């Protein structure tokens, strides 16, 4: 078998993840580090691996990720979307399974910008009646 690789791009908040799936034994590397070294807790790792678990391909692919920007939760969400999109490239039969579990939907929520005259996005100065 030749060098087959499936690529996917995921975004979440301000994080961008470039995911590459290669047929293999199931190892995952994030910025050349293992997930339990890169992420502080296991819940984030479980969230990131969901597309592989749902499609039952956890042991079929090696996952190589380059992720930049944002925090750990945003990065995990970006990786999750990238893995789901790469799985679609590998096998389009996964579309229905991933679509039902909302793995293919890009989460549009992002930080709201600060407005002038306010202390934050919505926090306003204290109101004085007199």
From Swiss-Prot:
Keywords from the UniProt entry: Ribonucleoprotein, Ribosomal protein
GO MF entry, a single one: structural constituent of ribosome
Cross-referenced Pfam families: Ribosomal_S9
Coiled-coil parts of chain: none
InterPro entries from the UniProt entry: Ribosomal_Su5_D2-typ_SF, Ribosomal_uS9, Ribosomal_uS9_bac/plastid, Ribosomal_uS9_CS, Ribsml_uS5_D2-typ_fold_subgr
GO aspect biological process, one term: translation
Region of interest (Disordered), ranges: 109-130
Keyword Ribosomal protein: yes
Gene Ontology cellular component terms for the protein in this record: cytosolic small ribosomal subunit
Disulfide-bond pairs as recorded: none
Record family assignment: Belongs to the universal ribosomal protein uS9 family.
PANTHER family: RIBOSOMAL PROTEIN S9 (PTHR21569), SMALL RIBOSOMAL SUBUNIT PROTEIN US9M (PTHR21569:SF1)
Name of the featured protein: Small ribosomal subunit protein uS9
Organism: Malacoplasma penetrans (strain HF-2)
Lineage: Bacteria, Bacillati, Mycoplasmatota, Mycoplasmoidales, Mycoplasmoidaceae
Name of the gene this protein is made from: rpsI
């Amino acid at each position: 078998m030749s060098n087959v690789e499936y690529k996917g791009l995921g975004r979440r908040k301000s994080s961008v993840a470039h995911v590459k799936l290669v047929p293999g034994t199931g190892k995952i590397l994030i910025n050349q580090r293992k997930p339990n070294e890169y992420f502080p807790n296991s819940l984030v790792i479980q969230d990131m691996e969901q597309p592989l678990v749902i499609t039952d391909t956890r042991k079929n692919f090696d996952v190589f990720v380059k992720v930049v920007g944002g925090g750990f939760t945003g990065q995990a969400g970006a990786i999750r979307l990238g893995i789901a999109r790469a799985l679609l490239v590998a096998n389009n039969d996964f579309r229905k399974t991933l679509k039902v579990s909302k793995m293919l939907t890009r989460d549009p929520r992002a930080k709201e910008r600060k407005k002038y005259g306010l202390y934050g996005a919505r926090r306003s100065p204290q109101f004085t009646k007199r």
